[in-house]
Amino acid sequence: VETILLVILVVVTVTMIIAVLLQRSEGGALGIGGGGGNAVDHMLSANLEGVEFINANTDSQALHRSGVSKVMQLGEGLTKGLGAGANPDVGCQAATEDRDKIAAALEGTDMIFLTAGMGGGTGTGAAPVVAHLAREKGILTVAVVTRPFNFEGKKRIAAADQGIKELGELVDSLIVIPNERILEVMGGKITLLEAFSKANEVLLNAVQGISELITRPGLINVDFADVRTVMSEMGMAMMGSATATGPDRSIEAARGAVCSPLLEEVDIHGAKGLLVNVSAGPDMELAEFAQVGEIVNEYASEDGTVVIGTVLDPEMEGELRVTMVATGIRNRTLTPQITLVKDGEVEDAVE
């Protein structure tokens, strides 16, 4: 059976870019990508298997600077290649102008990841248009979006919040990554480059954690139908990833993943769906896999669906990584415990 996945990423760095990824192949085909300078480079440097990037942007200069091989100009007649000017209405009009072009890219696709740097013009305005087109085609759509830093201003944050609200009504599952949390968790002395790099890493973890379950072999395999069950029509979602080493690595990685310090403050207890990727070398023990399962099952509702798969990576000898996506989350927390996971150790960072 041919399974086709499409990933569309809209990320803010210096410019706003929509990165559209498309690949077709037998079995479980995969498309993964990132947009905007460091995000694209980070995705490319990760050497994700079976990945093809296509950047689509309203800014023609940004497309020329793009490191990916395929590009798509959006709204050329409207913007003349000069970008959306931080105006979501222009971004929306640009995407609407090229609805047929976007729809053609979506054709035959089973799943997309839509990742947007919300608050700017192209991402905030174009992402809902793409999501709507995907919904019309019955494509499973998972959005992973960033919320601006506070220093980016109230107007940009307000635009982001409106865009997040609109996008949430169109996608199957929505994960929000507030950039401001990076400053809280990593400290105020972090450089701007490091802050955006960390955000790009979270974006990579989200896409990689889900896609690898479908595309890479493991002792316990997960197929596209499993992913659809957990993520279809679920609403608010949360993603966390952590890597640990040592005798308690499975417990530390699982706890670190569910704490998810860089993601939106949500209470995942009672989640309707849990999708878990346990990645490790061939030294992973059955008891470790069971420990991860016990911890993540604490957060699922009684009638929730839990899907756990493994990915074996020979280069991860001695390491164990847990990536978890919790879907169907109902309540936000007001003062969650934030935990920073580093080198296999779990430390309280912010309360």
Give the location of each predicted region.
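Tubulin/FtsZ superfamily GTPase core signature
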Residues: 32-351
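Short terminal targeting/anchoring segments
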Residues: 18, 23-34
